[in-house]
């Protein structure tokens, strides 16, 4: 049976997988050409010695197909750039950088920090009636262009349905790495979903009910985004996100004065600590960052990988998926996995982190996935193997590939795909998967509130592991936070007032939530509960 590396998709993951679930494989074209970068990488490994070389040898021995058939390169997307006359506004980063002001010391300084000269932001006001998505709500679409590196990130902005002059602004990020945030828009929390007739359906529980929301396709070559280059680590992607937000708020200062939050799921557990840290590192900025929210995230692998066996074997609140022998095999593999992750944490070297990712994903995620059970929802089987277990993802992709849809939003690529598995491999083979980005969270907690929430039916980024890493995190409030018990989280208003929707613990700027009856994508499975906690979080209830 062929075993392949993991993928956090939608923010969800597909680890070691037999043919019946989505796996990582070679592109249909150019396989021979794309295999060369990995061969070159393996040649470089011959210069290593000691533990690093031993780890690579061990991984290659256990999982030869991983090493032989997974390139670290991605093909550029076919695209046709629209003329500047198509866009309503083009914000030049060089113009933003050219603005100087007098600082408190009386010396001249830039109005806004950051290296923005190479960036432009293209903006088009989208006609909601053209697509029937949230008619009456102001919308903008466009691209952030990095002209030096030929990178072009697509975004779609929806104004708040309620009070856009005062409601906060939220950036939403799906995970992967390599999955489009437009999946989150149409499958989870956006103003419309797509039905089996490939038609948009109004979402009463959209997150833009009381907030303006930006959905961003990042990194490049994801969704409607494209590039001739590649981004293969989270830190590089953070520079692009800072540039996009800076130029967007420069064009729309009416939103810049409002509170801003970053939310996302799954691999956004990597993205968000980095992106928020990047924003906060710029003292002179026009981004009013107030908090971050991470749903069913992968943030601290060393802690979280402890909880795959318990979740799969009946200790997470749902019946066991695996038999005793499989559970024992996961127990047997865990010490070696943790040792490899510790080495990755200690060195942050790609040579150490890559084999840790491959070994641990195959050893601890593989047994579960080979059962055919949905890795994103422990309650059922994988229903649609061609669309990451969800038929709805296929509907979304079909809709976004319609010519009239691409024309209406100004998309420049010839086609849309929900997830780009080349990007996933790029991140994995650059060691990004296992790197300890959770170490940035204490710095965030010094300045802003952090919410970690988790649907309790998810396997891949399960609530047990997310709760555990928040309790293990070293920060000044750890002694007070860690021992706190979970308390009931209930709906406060409407006809369902008093209904239990989950559990919560909170101290200082740190909050953890368990959401009942939801898998990896909480807003899709529990739309009312997700909007309830989202609105209350933005309202500052727990900070």
Curated annotation (Swiss-Prot):
<feature type="disulfide bond">
    <location>
        <begin position="382"/>
        <end position="389"/>
    </location>
</feature>
<feature type="active site">
    <location>
        <position position="266"/>
    </location>
</feature>
<feature type="disulfide bond">
    <location>
        <begin position="344"/>
        <end position="353"/>
    </location>
</feature>
<feature type="disulfide bond">
    <location>
        <begin position="179"/>
        <end position="419"/>
    </location>
</feature>
<dbReference type="InterPro" id="IPR001563">
    <property type="entry name" value="Peptidase_S10"/>
</dbReference>
<dbReference type="GO" id="GO:0000324">
    <property type="term" value="C:fungal-type vacuole"/>
</dbReference>
<feature type="signal peptide">
    <location>
        <begin position="1"/>
        <end position="17"/>
    </location>
</feature>
<keyword id="KW-1015">Disulfide bond</keyword>
<keyword id="KW-0645">Protease</keyword>
<comment type="function">
    <text>Vacuolar carboxypeptidase involved in degradation of small peptides. Digests preferentially peptides containing an aliphatic or hydrophobic residue in P1' position, as well as methionine, leucine or phenylalanine in P1 position of ester substrate.</text>
</comment>
<feature type="propeptide">
    <location>
        <begin position="18"/>
        <end position="124"/>
    </location>
</feature>
<feature type="disulfide bond">
    <location>
        <begin position="337"/>
        <end position="360"/>
    </location>
</feature>
<keyword id="KW-0121">Carboxypeptidase</keyword>
<dbReference type="InterPro" id="IPR008442">
    <property type="entry name" value="Propeptide_carboxypepY"/>
</dbReference>
<feature type="disulfide bond">
    <location>
        <begin position="313"/>
        <end position="327"/>
    </location>
</feature>
<comment type="similarity">
    <text>Belongs to the peptidase S10 family.</text>
</comment>
<keyword id="KW-0325">Glycoprotein</keyword>
<dbReference type="InterPro" id="IPR018202">
    <property type="entry name" value="Ser_caboxypep_ser_AS"/>
</dbReference>
<keyword id="KW-0378">Hydrolase</keyword>
<feature type="active site">
    <location>
        <position position="458"/>
    </location>
</feature>
<protein>
    <recommendedName>
        <fullName>Carboxypeptidase Y homolog A</fullName>
        <ecNumber>3.4.16.5</ecNumber>
    </recommendedName>
</protein>
<feature type="glycosylation site" description="N-linked (GlcNAc...) asparagine">
    <location>
        <position position="210"/>
    </location>
</feature>
<keyword id="KW-0732">Signal</keyword>
<dbReference type="Pfam" id="PF05388">
    <property type="entry name" value="Carbpep_Y_N"/>
</dbReference>
<keyword id="KW-0865">Zymogen</keyword>
<dbReference type="InterPro" id="IPR029058">
    <property type="entry name" value="AB_hydrolase_fold"/>
</dbReference>
<dbReference type="GO" id="GO:0006508">
    <property type="term" value="P:proteolysis"/>
</dbReference>
<dbReference type="GO" id="GO:0004185">
    <property type="term" value="F:serine-type carboxypeptidase activity"/>
</dbReference>
<feature type="glycosylation site" description="N-linked (GlcNAc...) asparagine">
    <location>
        <position position="509"/>
    </location>
</feature>
<dbReference type="Pfam" id="PF00450">
    <property type="entry name" value="Peptidase_S10"/>
</dbReference>
<feature type="active site">
    <location>
        <position position="520"/>
    </location>
</feature>
<keyword id="KW-0926">Vacuole</keyword>
């Amino acid at each position: 049976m062929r075993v392949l590396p993991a993928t956090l998709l939608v923010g969800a993951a597909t680890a070691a997988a037999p043919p019946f679930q989505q796996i990582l494989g070679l592109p249909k074209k150019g396989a021979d050409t794309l295999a060369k970068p990995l061969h070159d990488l393996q040649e470089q490994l011959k210069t290593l010695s000691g533990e690093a070389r031993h780890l690579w040898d061990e991984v290659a021995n256990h999982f030869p197909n991983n090493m032989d058939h997974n390139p670290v390169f991605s093909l550029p997307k076919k695209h046709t750039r629209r003329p500047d006359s198509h866009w309503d506004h083009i914000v030049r980063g060089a113009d933003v950088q050219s603005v100087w002001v007098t600082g408190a010391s009386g010396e001249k300084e830039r109005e806004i920090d950051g290296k923005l000269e190479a960036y432009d932001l293209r903006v088009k006001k989208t006609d909601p009636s053209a697509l029937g998505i949230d008619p009456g709500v102001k919308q903008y679409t466009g691209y952030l262009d990095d002209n030096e590196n030929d990178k072009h990130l697509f975004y779609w902005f929806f104004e708040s349905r309620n009070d856009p002059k005062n409601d906060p602004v939220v950036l939403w990020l799906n995970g992967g790495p390599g999955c489009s945030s437009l999946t989150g828009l149409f499958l989870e929390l956006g103003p419309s979903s797509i039905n089996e007739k490939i038609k948009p359906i109004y979402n009463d529980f959209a997150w833009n009910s009381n907030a303006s929301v930006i959905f961003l396709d990042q990194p490049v070559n994801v969704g409607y985004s494209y590039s001739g280059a590649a981004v293969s680590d989270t830190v590089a992607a953070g520079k692009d996100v800072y540039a996009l937000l800076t130029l967007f708020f420069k064009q729309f200062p009416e939103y810049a004065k409002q509170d801003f939050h970053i939310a996302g799921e799954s691999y956004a557990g990597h993205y968000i600590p980095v992106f928020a840290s990047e924003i906060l590192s710029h003292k002179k900025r026009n981004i009013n960052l107030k908090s971050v929210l991470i749903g069913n995230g992968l943030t601290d692998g060393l802690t979280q990988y402890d909880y795959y066996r318990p979740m799969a074997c009946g200790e997470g609140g749902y019946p066991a998926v695996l038999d005793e022998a499989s559970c024992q095999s996961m127990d047997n593999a865990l010490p070696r996995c943790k040792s490899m992750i510790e080495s990755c944490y200690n060195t942050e070297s790609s040579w150490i982190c890559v084999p840790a990712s491959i070994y641990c994903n195959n050893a601890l995620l593989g047994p579960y996935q080979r059962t055919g059970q949905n890795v994103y929802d422990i309650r059922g089987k994988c229903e649609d193997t061609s669309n990451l277990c969800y038929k709805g993802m296929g509907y979304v992709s079909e809709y976004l590939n319609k010519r009239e849809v691409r024309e209406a939003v100004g998309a420049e690529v010839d086609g849309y795909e929900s997830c780009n598995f080349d990007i996933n491999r790029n991140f994995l083979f650059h060691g990004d998967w296992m790197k300890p980005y959770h170490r940035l969270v204490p710095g965030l907690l010094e300045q802003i509130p952090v919410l970690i929430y988790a649907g309790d039916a998810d396997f891949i980024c399960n609530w047990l592991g997310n709760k555990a890493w928040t309790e293990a995190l070293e920060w000044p409030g750890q002694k007070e936070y860690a021992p706190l018990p979970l308390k009931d989280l209930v709906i406060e208003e409407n006809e369902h007032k008093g209904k239990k929707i989950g559990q919560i613990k909170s101290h200082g700027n740190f909050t953890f939530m368990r959401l009942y009856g939801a898998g990896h994508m909480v807003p899709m499975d529990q739309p009312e509960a997700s909007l309830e906690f989202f609105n209350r979080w933005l309202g500052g209830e727990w900070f």
